[in-house]
Amino acid sequence: MEENGIPPVVILDNGSGYLKAGFSNQKTPEVSIPALVGRQLLRYGEKIEMKLLEGDDGPKYKEIMIGDEVIPYRSLLELSYPIDEGIIRNPDDLFKLWEYALTQKLKIEDPSEIRILVTEAPLNPISNKKTICEILFEKLGVKALNIEAQAKCSLFCEGIDSGIVLDSGDGVTHCIPISDGNIIKYNIERLDIAGRHITQYLIRLLQRKGYSFNSSADFEFVRYLKENIVLLVMISKMIGN
């Protein structure tokens, strides 16, 4: 996949809800998976029998599932969200998620040979960048790293360097002004309401109807309903205007 003898940069766009990954010479992400890590709930001594790993001493049960592996078994798993509201909450699980995306999904055999661009939300604390560096340099041993704001990347991919970006993800919403490629930080507006909060509101509405949702797997089920069934209707259409 090299261009002029130079390997493409690997891009990790990790939000609170989904991880998108791919190469800089591709128009769209090659990987888009839920940003989830699941661990088995050992109810009554049961294990997930459908996920077996063949080892030298016979089959082994897989204790941890990552990304899209989680979906078929979410009702049997305790789910972890490594990033919440744009902030890294669980570095160990984020490492597992990135390692899975790089080695299993992008088929990168040796991470030490790659250069990576990681996106993050604006106004994140310095500790967030420090954690990213620790994971990618110390644990994965990548060759080079650039951490860039998601909003700037959104403008650059359109061929412009000035504008206002409204970025509403799963955990947080930002309105970011950018001038000549520079973020005007003191004018950034942040709202800690986004897709995940809409899911939580939908859960409350369903609970009023008598439905019970208690586990993190239930949350993922309601999010699936929101993304695939729920329709957004303009108020003007509802009142016939």
Model region roles, listed by residue range:
Residues 114-120, 150-154, 218-224, 239-241:
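Short amphipathic alpha-helical segments embedded in low-complexity Lys/Glu-rich regions
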Residues 117-119, 155-156, 163, 232:
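Conserved, well-structured core segments
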Residues 3, 9-10, 14-135, 144, ...:
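Conserved phosphate-binding loops in N-terminal lobes of ATP-dependent enzymes
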Residues 1-4, 128-130, 138-166, 182, ...:
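Conserved phosphate-binding catalytic cores of ATP/NTP-utilizing and phosphoryl-transfer enzymes
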Residues 179-241:
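Phosphate-binding glycine-rich/basic clefts of nucleotide- and phosphate-handling proteins
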Residues 4-5, 12-17, 158-160, 165-173, ...:
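A short acidic Gly-Thr/Ser loop motif
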Residues 23, 129-131, 157-161, 176-180, ...:
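Short acidic, glycine/serine/threonine-rich loops at helix termini
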